[in-house]
Amino acid sequence: MTEPTNTLPNLGAAELAAYIDHTLLRPDAGAAEIAAWCDEAVTHGFKSVCVNPIQIPLVAAKLAGTGVGVCSVIGFPFGASPTAVKVAEAAWVVAHGATEVDMVIDIGALKDGRAEAVRDDIAAVKAACGKALLKVIIEACLLDDEQKALACRLSAEAGADFVKTSTGFAGGGATAKDVALMRRTVGSALGVKASGGVRTRDDALRMIAAGASRIGASASIAIVAEADAASTGAKGGY
């Protein structure tokens, strides 16, 4: 799906699961499916369950005491809400149990060169997050490399905890090249989340090899099943 990486890390199913935000952002996802998603996350040890804001109270209740994080998107998927709306949305999801917030930047402002507006938008949401982690979605497929790097720098300056490649709703997803650029830009100061189009074990491992510290995926079960099969095959091979 993306540029090959020569050497992939050797991660077992449990190790790989710990990188993954088990993601369900379809607008037609109902309560039963969301609840099952939470059960899967607990069973496999995924890092968090990532859902739309309206589902956060259910997810927080289902995951209470499990150690699995509760992640909400805001300003999603276009990032085109006024800052005050993003702040209200962030405050609401945190009040209802979100431990992580994935926001979309003001993409138009970034492309217009209005860096201060982008930084202020992120900083305001960060303040509303309190102790919750903030991941900033830069929507890399809509940006050139200079804009990608700028978005990462502004996120760091605004106090974000992670930068994230994609919403998965803009026609492009994570690439190893973009992840590597983002990692070079933020260094070790921030996490880097690869999301959008990560569907296989090798996809996930390429992202991690390029510098990702978190993976967003809806194909999480298939990814860890492949990792488990690869590990079993290696142990049982001749």
UniProtKB/Swiss-Prot annotation:
Annotated metabolic or biological route of this protein: Carbohydrate degradation; 2-deoxy-D-ribose 1-phosphate degradation; D-glyceraldehyde 3-phosphate and acetaldehyde from 2-deoxy-alpha-D-ribose 1-phosphate: step 2/2
Keyword Lyase found: yes
SMART domains found in the cross-reference section: DeoC
Organism domain of life: Bacteria
Molecular function terms from GO: deoxyribose-phosphate aldolase activity
Gene3D superfamilies xrefs: Aldolase class I
Residues annotated as catalytic: D102 (proton donor/acceptor), K164 (schiff-base intermediate with acetaldehyde), K193 (proton donor/acceptor)
Ranges annotated as spanning the membrane: none
Catalysed conversion reaction: 2-deoxy-D-ribose 5-phosphate = D-glyceraldehyde 3-phosphate + acetaldehyde
Localization in the cell: Cytoplasm
Any one of the GO CC terms: cytoplasm
Alphabetized CDD domains for the sequence: DeoC
Gene Ontology BP annotations: 2-deoxyribose 1-phosphate catabolic process; carbohydrate catabolic process; deoxyribonucleotide catabolic process
EC numbers on record: 4.1.2.4
Keywords: Cytoplasm, Lyase, Schiff base
Family classification: Belongs to the DeoC/FbaB aldolase family. DeoC type 1 subfamily.
Biological role: Catalyzes a reversible aldol reaction between acetaldehyde and D-glyceraldehyde 3-phosphate to generate 2-deoxy-D-ribose 5-phosphate.
PANTHER family, sorted: DEOXYRIBOSE-PHOSPHATE ALDOLASE
Protein name: Deoxyribose-phosphate aldolase
Originating species: Rhodospirillum rubrum (strain ATCC 11170 / ATH 1.1.1 / DSM 467 / LMG 4362 / NCIMB 8255 / S1)
